[in-house]
């Protein structure tokens, strides 16, 4: 259970990285520099800071691809978990549960599984108290 929670936290972190706003490209920075005809030292420092963001864009590309792979695997795992939970919880056949899960969106599946494990974790904590 602990590993599942840690894995979900990592997936959420990668989601934040992958969906963050893309950095400006070096070409766009050159256009800004030409348009503004930099006179102030502050503007030069600002543009230098933005030029460093291109490295972040490359890193985001790597993490974006990694995130897509992790997200795809996580979606498949969550789909299987949702079917198992429905079969166990509602006492229906696997085919019926699969049909219900197929009708749900990916977001609904994630929420369903997380809600189930959240309740389960809360019950375990309350039993220990």
Curated annotation (Swiss-Prot):
GO terms for biological process: defense response to bacterium; killing of cells of another organism. Coiled coil: none annotated. GO terms for cellular component: extracellular region. Keywords: Antibiotic, Antimicrobial, Cytolysis, Hemolysis, Secreted, Signal, Toxin. Residues 21-60 form a propeptide. The keyword Cell cycle does not apply. One of its GO terms (molecular function) is toxin activity. Its main location: secreted. Disulfide bonds: none annotated. Pfam families: Latarcin. InterPro entries: Latarcin_precursor. It is found in: Secreted. Expressed by the venom gland. Residues 1-20 form the signal peptide. Insecticidal, cytolytic and antimicrobial peptide. Forms voltage-dependent, ion-permeable channels in membranes. At high concentration causes cell membrane lysis. Belongs to the cationic peptide 06 (cytoinsectotoxin) family. This is M-zodatoxin-Lt8k. It comes from Lachesana tarabaevi.
């Amino acid at each position: 259970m602990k590993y599942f929670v840690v894995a979900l936290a990592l997936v959420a972190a990668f989601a934040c990285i992958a969906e963050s706003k893309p950095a400006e490209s070096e070409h766009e920075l050159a256009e800004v520099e030409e348009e503004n005809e930099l006179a102030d030292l502050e503007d030069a420092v600002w543009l230098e800071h933005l030029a460093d963001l291109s490295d972040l864009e490359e890193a985001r590309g790597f993490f974006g691809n990694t995130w897509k792979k992790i997200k795809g695997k996580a979606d498949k795992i969550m789909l299987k978990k949702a079917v198992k939970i429905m079969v166990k919880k509602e006492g229906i056949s696997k085919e019926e549960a699969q049909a219900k899960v197929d009708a749900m969106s990916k977001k609904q599946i994630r929420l369903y599984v997380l809600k189930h494990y959240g309740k389960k974790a809360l019950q375990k904590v309350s039993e220990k108290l």
